[in-house]
């Protein structure tokens, strides 16, 4: 095994592994020739177990050496030592290292046609671990069915906790934020009811956004609870992905519509705003599809890194399109006021627009950049902190946005004299 494939796998591990979840998983590896395959990343804070079962193993190789094909667990502390061994000898097989937790090799497999084996390994040292499959035989392709179970033995009665270090707090965290959003929704509904004479269409869309966000969080809490207790989601992952998809698309639609003054400054969207929606919505659809694929598979999938790249590019492109449209819209409004007398008095609305644009840019920067850095840098026992930071930032953004554009009579952003002025103010 050369050092380059192993370094590539380690790089992917450090960059993207916060997206993997330690639970019960079953997957198939088909005709794969990769020298090393990252199967799972997990953290253990007390006594834990790793169980790996393989079946229907098939190997295509010109020179078969079953002892050079197998599974191992590598701790974060041992990683530098293994890299040093590979640097000193490029042909060194990582399965021969003294720094790994050796699981089993294909020598242990039962005879064909079943070709299966299962082993459970106790882990008693708290650390950040990674489960790998190594193929040290050149030009060898492997196909097999793999079943993994990773859990904590926390209770004397033998019950298991499948949400490992850094994720065990997620069910309670999502439940708390669900209650926050539910209270927010009730307050918003009461406020809109008391001001129903001036409620606009955008306020109805904002109400739908709050409702779907609340449902997303309660589904996330139930989803993580079932994974924690049983190791599987029992279908709640599908419900969660549906509401998450609707929530994200609604959020970006609300941002675009508010930023362009729909139902506040003008009764309908113009061509440029419609084009922006045509760009933003499909990009978010693509990003959500990529997010689902990433969440439901893992680094053992050959195109997993590509899906991560698709998610990142689609999401960042969408955010950049929104920021560019906001800045361009403000510049156009400022230039229009120099030649249009009726538009001059509406420059008073620019400070409010500017505040909203700064709020959006700050929110996008924090959730897309700062949170990702937190996930990469945080200790494995504090991975949940990045989730908490993201939810706090999102709730704060919602509160400020809803406060700025609440349905009141004297709203400096919504106060427009008449429909004729609205049409003249519209950016063509």
From Swiss-Prot:
User: What organism is recorded for this protein?
Assistant: Arabidopsis thaliana
- Transmembrane stretches, start-end: 173-193, 202-222, 238-258, 276-296, 310-330, 356-376, 385-405
Which N-terminal stretch is annotated as signal sequence? 1-22
Which keywords annotate this record? Answer: G-protein coupled receptor, Glycoprotein, Membrane, Receptor, Signal, Transducer, Transmembrane, Transmembrane helix
- Can you say where in the cell this protein is located? Membrane
Which protein are we looking at?
Protein CANDIDATE G-PROTEIN COUPLED RECEPTOR 6
This protein's GO cellular component annotations are: membrane
- InterPro entries in the cross-refs: CAND6-7_N, GOST_TM, GPR107/GPR108-like
Going by the UniProt annotation, this protein carries glycans at 31, 89, 157
PANTHER family on file: LUNG SEVEN TRANSMEMBRANE RECEPTOR, RE59932P
Q: Record's superkingdom?
A: Eukaryota
Q: Which family does it belong to?
A: Belongs to the LU7TM family.
Main role?
G-protein coupled receptor. Plays a role in plants and microbes interactions.
One annotated GO biological process:
G protein-coupled receptor signaling pathway
Q: GO molecular function of the protein, one example?
A: G protein-coupled receptor activity
Q: How does the entry describe its membrane topology?
A: Multi-pass membrane protein
């Amino acid at each position: 095994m050369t050092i380059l494939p192993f370094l590539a796998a380690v790089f992917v591990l450090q960059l993207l592994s916060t997206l993997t979840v330690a639970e019960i998983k079953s997957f198939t590896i088909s005709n794969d020739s990769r020298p090393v395959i990252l199967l799972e990343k997990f953290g253990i804070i007390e006594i834990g177990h790793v169980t790996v079962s393989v079946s229907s193993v098939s190997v295509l190789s010109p020179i078969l050496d079953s002892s050079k094909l197998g599974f191992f667990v590598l701790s974060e502390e041992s990683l530098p030592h293994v890299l040093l061994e590979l640097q000193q000898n490029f042909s060194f097989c990582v399965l021969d290292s003294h720094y790994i937790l050796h699981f089993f090799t294909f020598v242990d497999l039962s005879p064909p046609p079943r070709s299966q084996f299962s082993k459970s390994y106790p882990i008693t040292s708290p650390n950040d671990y990674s489960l790998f499959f190594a193929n040290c035989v050149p030009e060898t392709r492997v196909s097999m069915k793999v079943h993994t179970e990773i859990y904590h033995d926390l209770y004397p009665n033998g019950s298991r906790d499948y949400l490992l270090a850094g994720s065990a707090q997620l069910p309670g965290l999502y439940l708390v934020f669900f209650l926050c959003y539910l209270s927010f929704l009730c307050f918003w509904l009461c406020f809109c009811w008391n001001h129903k004479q001036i409620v606009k269409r955008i306020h109805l869309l904002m109400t739908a956004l709050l409702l779907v966000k609340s449902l997303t969080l309660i589904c996330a809490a139930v989803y993580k609870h079932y994974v924690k207790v049983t190791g599987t989601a029992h279908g709640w992952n599908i419900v969660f992905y549906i509401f998450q998809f609707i929530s994200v698309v609604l959020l970006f639609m609300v941002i675009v519509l508010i930023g362009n003054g729909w139902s506040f400054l003008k009764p309908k969207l113009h061509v440029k705003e419609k084009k922006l929606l045509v760009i933003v919505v499909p990009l978010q659809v693509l990003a959500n599809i990529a997010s689902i694929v990433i969440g439901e598979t893992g680094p053992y999938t050959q195109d997993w890194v590509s899906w991560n790249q698709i998610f990142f590019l689609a999401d960042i492109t969408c955010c950049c399109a929104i920021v560019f449209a906001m800045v361009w819209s403000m510049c156009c409004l400022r230039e229009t006021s120099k030649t249009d007398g009726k538009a001059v008095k509406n420059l008073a609305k620019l400070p409010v627009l500017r505040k909203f644009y700064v709020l959006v840019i700050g929110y996008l920067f924090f959730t897309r950049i700062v949170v990702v850095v937190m996930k990469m840098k945080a200790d494995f026992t504090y991975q949940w902190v990045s989730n908490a930071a993201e939810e706090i930032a999102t709730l704060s953004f919602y509160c400020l946005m809803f406060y700025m554009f609440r349905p009141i009579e004297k709203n400096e952003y919504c106060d427009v004299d008449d429909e004729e002025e609205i049409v003249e103010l519209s950016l063509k």
